[in-house]
Swiss-Prot record:
Protein family (similarity comment): Belongs to the glycosyltransferase 28 family. MurG subfamily.
Physiological role: Cell wall formation. Catalyzes the transfer of a GlcNAc subunit on undecaprenyl-pyrophosphoryl-MurNAc-pentapeptide (lipid intermediate I) to form undecaprenyl-pyrophosphoryl-MurNAc-(pentapeptide)GlcNAc (lipid intermediate II).
SUPFAM superfamilies: UDP-Glycosyltransferase/glycogen phosphorylase
Official protein name in the record: UDP-N-acetylglucosamine--N-acetylmuramyl-(pentapeptide) pyrophosphoryl-undecaprenol N-acetylglucosamine transferase
Residue positions binding UDP-N-acetyl-alpha-D-glucosamine: T10, A11, G12, N124, R161, S195, Q295
GO biological process: carbohydrate metabolic process; cell division; cell wall organization; lipid glycosylation; peptidoglycan biosynthetic process; regulation of cell shape
EC code: 2.4.1.227
Main location as per UniProt: membrane
Gene name of this polypeptide: murG
NCBIfam families, sorted: murG (TIGR01133)
GO cellular component, one term: plasma membrane
Keywords in alphabetical order: Cell cycle, Cell division, Cell membrane, Cell shape, Cell wall biogenesis/degradation, Glycosyltransferase, Membrane, Peptidoglycan synthesis, Transferase
CDD domains xrefs: GT28_MurG (cd03785)
Length: 369
């Protein structure tokens, strides 16, 4: 069996695709796997590092508004679909799996044109255009949650890396804090703005560092590769005996980040929400203020269950860290209660369930052919 995965662009698309690839390979070491991506996406680094083949196609951004860029979409899409068709033929693909994003729509179109079965996986509470279109023409549609409305949808969750899906935070806490050079006992706030970073979150945290230090809170700050220089230059002077402040551009070991943290301050991407629920880590979610509002909807079930707090991006310009984050990160009893409520919503086996669906789709093709 050969599987082609279309999930490039951001970590929220790439990581579930890679996790599915690993689940398929655990079942059959001989399975062929090719990931589709674009030359400018994170996949150019992440996919080879995990040992899988990467095939690059032209990205086809779909403007949300009427702009001159819309005029270029048809020609770009034709070129990308043609390239995917070539890859499907060269690999002898049995099934394609799309995760939304810039490379998914060309993948779905190429699969449909060539009669190849394909699987759609939608992680976001509000599906994007590629998956809304793709779900109309296949029986194999998986969604993160039953509330996500797509044709033929089966709620399976979001595939999570094994080290996260199997994480015992309490058992790994000492190891994780030592790994990052953090104190073993101090209240610990982890900050992450997604794979590209978040300027508003970064600026608010840097401004609040003296206050957090005065309260004995140590900070593990993943600023994003595009934001790291700005954060480094804006840091205030710190006393030699101040609680630890660890600044990173990117974290490849998010399992250890989650094990080290008492509380996350983060965006509300679908993958982030799924991971935090699965490991039972309370969070203050700051959804992206633009887009189609899917990040707020991603966090909504966790917040309503009491496993997280929702904070508007605009509130970061005020004293939200003093009012909301600081009292929470130092309240162990409340954090423990929130952890349990978040964990009750977590799903840890979505990789295996999605692998079942992929094998079902591939088997249907073999029966037909």
């Amino acid at each position: 069996m050969h599987v082609v995965l279309a999930g490039g662009g951001t970590a929220g698309h790439i990581e579930p695709a890679l996790t599915l690839a690993e689940a398929l390979r655990r079942r059959d070491v001989g399975v062929g796997i090719t990931l589709l991506g674009s030359p400018r996406g994170l996949e150019t680094r992440l996919v080879p590092a995990r040992g899988f083949d990467l095939a690059l196609i032209p990205a086809v951004p779909l403007p949300r508004r009427l702009t001159p860029d819309l005029l270029a979409v048809p020609s770009r899409l034709r070129a990308a679909v043609g390239e995917v068709e070539r890859i499907l033929a060269e690999t002898g693909a049995d099934v394609l799996v799309g995760f939304g994003g810039y490379v998914a729509l060309p993948g779905y179109l190429a699969a449909r044109r060539t009669g190849l079965p394909y699987v759609v996986h939608e992680a976001n509470a509000r599906p994007g255009l590629a998956n809304r279109w793709g779900a109309r023409f296949t029986r194999y549609v998986a969604v993160a949650d039953a509330a996500i409305r797509l044709p033929h949808a089966v709620p399976l969750g979001i595939p999570l890396r094994r080290e996260i899906a199997t994480l015992d935070r309490a058992a790994r806490r000492a190891e994780a804090r030592a790994y990052f050079g953090l104190d073993a006992e101090a209240p610990t706030l982890a900050v992450a703005g997604g794979s590209q970073g978040a300027r508003s979150i970064n600026r608010a945290v840097v401004a609040a560092l003296p206050m957090l230090a005065a309260a004995g809170v140590q900070v593990l700050h993943i600023a994003g590769p595009q934001q790291i220089a700005e954060v480094e230059s804006a840091q205030p002077k710190r006393a030699p005996d101040a609680p630890a402040y660890v600044l990173l551009p990117y974290a490849d070991r998010m399992d250890l980040v989650y094990a080290a943290a008492d509380l996350m301050l983060c965006r509300a991407g679908a993958l982030t929400c799924a991971e935090l629920a699965a490991v039972g880590l309370p969070a203050v979610y700051v959804p992206l203020p633009h887009g189609n509002g899917e990040q707020r909807l991603n966090a909504k079930p966790i917040v309503e269950a009491g496993g997280g707090v929702l904070l508007r991006d605009a509130e970061l310009r005020g004293d939200a860290i003093r009012r909301i984050v600081l009292p929470l990160v130092t309240d162990r009893a409340r954090l423990a209660e929130m952890a349990g409520r978040a964990a009750a919503l977590g799903r840890r086996d979505a990789d295996e369930r999605l692998a079942d669906l992929v094998e079902q789709a591939a088997a249907a093709r073999r029966v037909v052919t």
